């Protein structure tokens, strides 16, 4: 599997890290065709199945809002029973097991968001608007982790809230200073001070 295959097949942390690498290469090379394709795939991951729906999901779809039309991030106002699941990254959350409430604190979700946020920043700098796509899907993912899962960023995920606060507004998420670098980005507490 190459970088493009990974990005276009894996709706989880692997696919998001591959997507971040893919858009970084395309942006660096000025390959607008590749960048446009990667943006469509990312928009599909965020929930716009009309943009892209070619992902291969794991067998457990119990965290999906609509198992017949799975997405990378559940849509706004989605519930399973009486539980609010809008904003979940279902293919990463499933790694903690089938749907249960209260939700398990599954770190793969943060790993998926590490790749997704890096991808979003590069796309933003290339002229796209990923932070607003699908009713601010990325923001909703972090809000779900904070409010529904009561799971704040720790360890190598602490750079993420600084990025969220930079793009969505100061104080959106509690942030740690100093933060730790993640798998693909770091030092956001220094490079992205509150605006």
Residue ranges, per PLM feature:
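Aromatic-lined, polymer-binding surfaces characteristic
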Residues: 1-126
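CBM-like carbohydrate-recognition segments
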Residues: 104-105, 125, 129-195
């Amino acid at each position: 599997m190459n970088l493009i295959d990974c990005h276009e097949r894996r709706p989880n942390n692997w696919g998001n890290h591959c997507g971040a690498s893919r858009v970084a290469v395309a942006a660096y090379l000025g390959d607008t065709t590749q960048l446009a394709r990667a943006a469509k795939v990312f928009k599909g991951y965020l929930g716009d199945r009309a943009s892209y729906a070619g992902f291969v999901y794991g067998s457990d779809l119990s965290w999906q809002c609509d198992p017949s039309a799975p997405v990378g991030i559940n849509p706004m106002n989605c519930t399973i029973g009486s539980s609010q699941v809008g904003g979940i990254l279902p293919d990463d959350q499933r790694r903690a097991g089938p749907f249960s409430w209260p939700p398990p604190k599954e770190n793969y979700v943060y790993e998926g968001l590490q790749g997704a946020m890096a991808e979003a920043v590069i796309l933003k700098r290339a002229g796209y608007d990923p932070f607003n796509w699908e009713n601010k899907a990325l923001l909703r993912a972090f809000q779900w982790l904070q409010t529904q899962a009561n799971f704040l960023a720790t360890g190598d995920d602490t750079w993420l809230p600084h990025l969220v606060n930079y793009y969505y507004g100061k104080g959106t998420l509690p942030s740690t200073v100093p933060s730790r670098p993640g798998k693909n980005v770091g030092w956001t507490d220094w490079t992205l001070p509150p605006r």
